Amino acid sequence: MNESITRRDILRTLAFGAAAGSVLQVIPAEAAEYVHQMVHKEKAAAPAGKYAPKYFSAPQYAALLFLCDTIIPKDEKSGGAVEAGAPEFIDLLTSENPEYQLKLGGGFFWLDAACTDRYGNVFMECTPEQKKEIMDLIAFRKNAKQDASLSQGVAFFAFLRNLTTDGFYTSKIGIADLQYMGNTALHEFPGCPPLPE
C-alpha cells in the first residue's frame, strides 16, 4: 500500500465508494483490509483490548452490536458480524463520513423514536419480542410502501445491512466463511465438458 496515503484518505475513499454501492463491488479489497487493520490497531492500543467507538454514543453502539449480530449471527460454521469486527468497521467508516453520520445517526434516532412511540421504551430497552417486531417492519422495503412512516427505518436498516455484510465479508472470518482461497492457477485446463447427445 502506498505509504503517502493517509488513514483519513483511505477511510474517506472507502466511505465514498460504499455510498455509491457495495464495498465488495466498488472498494478494493486492500482498502477494506486496511480498515480492518486500523480497527485491530485501535483495539490493541485500547485498555483491555476493547474497541472504543469513534462516532456512535454508547447506546447507539450497543444497538449497532445487537443489529449486526442479528443480521449475521454466529453459527457452527463461523463467527458472526460482531466477531468479524463489522460494528467497528462501520463505526470507523462513519467517523470520517458526514453522509454515513446522517444516515446511521438519524437511523438510530428514528429507531429509538419509533420504539418509544410503539412500546414506551428506546430500542435497546424493548423486550426481545418488541425488537423482533420492529426489525420485521424495517427489514423489508415493501413495508415502507404500505406505511410511509416506516420509510426512514427501512432505508436505515437496508444501509446498515449492506455495511454489515461488507464489514463481515471483507474480514478474515468472512473470507474464511466463503472458503475463498484466492486466485489460484490451474495446473491443467480440462476444457469444456462434452455436450449431451
What are these regions (language model features)?
Residues 2-3, 48, 59-66, 77-78, ...:
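Mature-region segments of soluble proteins
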Residues 71:
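Extracytoplasmic/periplasmic/luminal assembly and interaction segments
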Residues 1-18:
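N-terminal secretory signal peptides and thylakoid transit peptides that target proteins
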Residues 3-4, 25-66:
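C-terminal segment of N-terminal export signals and the immediately downstream linker at the start
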Residues 19, 23-25:
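Hydrophobic, helix-length membrane anchors
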Residues 17-18, 74, 167:
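Generic hydrophobic alpha-helical segments
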